[in-house]
Design a protein with these regions (language model features):
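N-terminal positively charged helical leader segments and presequences
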Residues: 1-82, 241
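Short secondary-structure boundary segments
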Residues: 10, 29, 93, 119, ...
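Structured adenosyl-cofactor binding patch, chiefly the S-adenosyl-L-methionine
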Residues: 14, 19, 109, 131-136, ...
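Short, ordered loop/turn segments at secondary-structure junctions
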Residues: 30-31, 51-54, 120-122, 147, ...
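Short basic, glycine-rich beta-strand/loop surfaces that mediate nucleic-acid
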Residues: 59-70, 133-136, 179-187
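RNA substrate-binding interface of SAM-dependent RNA methyltransferases
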Residues: 83-171
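Active-site/ligand-binding-proximal alpha/beta "capping" segment
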Residues: 163-217
């Protein structure tokens, strides 16, 4: 079993099981009652294992549960764009798996149709990232691309606006129409969105701050902007069915 095929954590495993992505659940012997475990037992085969075996196969805080996943479908960007998405998220240089997972979770909660990740200069979809996403990574269509700049150009050719989160941006999110098809581009904590990516985006959106710290972290900023997308779309009646 490869690391990429294994996830851990009760919420992440449960969401993957609800989506029909789980082959088998490994559950440590002696766990107390939890309704999530009851639901898991109805959704997927359970193998009760000694706690030390679970420690050996599941790194990190696993909460007594790990799962083997079915192979994740690999989407190309062309296939993703053929689904006529109204909301995409592109991640430019997100190297921390916790940030990666948190952004994917926010994207799925906000109704995103998919995510675009670079093949290089990105944290992998590791068990830690999947756990941080609470299983959202197993629900989203995810396309890996050779480079974000060329991907942005392709997204724009499909008629989708590209909006970069940028601390030096000139536009507040509520001053931009986020009800139209849009791809939100999120950069890394230190560097932000890279220059060539920024230049190819249609608009740079800035989240105003009132404190002494200059910016939100990447996952918090993404969550705030994705919430604004959802707020505008609910107000216009254009949320995804």
């Amino acid at each position: 079993m490869t690391a990429a095929a294994l996830i851990h954590g009760r919420n992440a495993v449960l969401e993957a099981a609800r989506a029909g992505k789980v082959v088998k659940v490994f559950q440590a012997a002696g766990l107390g009652h939890d309704p999530r475990l009851d639901e898991l037992a109805r959704l997927a085969p359970i193998e009760v294992v000694p706690p030390e075996r679970l420690e050996a196969i599941a790194a990190g805080v696993h909460q007594g549960v790990a799962a083997e996943l079915k192979p994740r479908r690999e989407w190309t960007l062309k296939e993703l764009l053929a689904t006529n998405p109204s909301l995409l998220v592109a991640l430019d240089g997100i190297m921390d798996p916790q940030n990666l997972g948190a952004i994917l979770r926010s994207a799925e909660v906000a109704g995103a149709d998919g995510a675009i990740l670079p093949e290089h200069r990105s944290a992998p979809l590791s068990p830690s990232a999947v756990k941080a996403s609470s299983g959202a990574s197993e629900l989203l269509r995810i396309a890996h691309v050779s480079g974000i700049p060329s991907a942005i150009a392709e997204v724009k050719r499909a008629g989708i606006w590209c909006a970069a989160l940028d601390v030096r941006g000139e536009t507040a999110p509520w001053d931009f129409d986020l009800t139209q098809p849009v791809c939100i581009v999120v950069g890394s904590e230190g560097e932000g969105v890279h220059r060539l990516v920024r230049e190819r985006c249609d608009v740079r959106l800035r989240l105003p701050v009132a404190g002494h710290v200059s910016s939100f972290n990447a996952s918090a900023a993404a969550a705030a902007l994705l919430y604004e997308v959802l707020r505008q779309r609910e107000g216009s009646g254009r949320t995804r069915p």
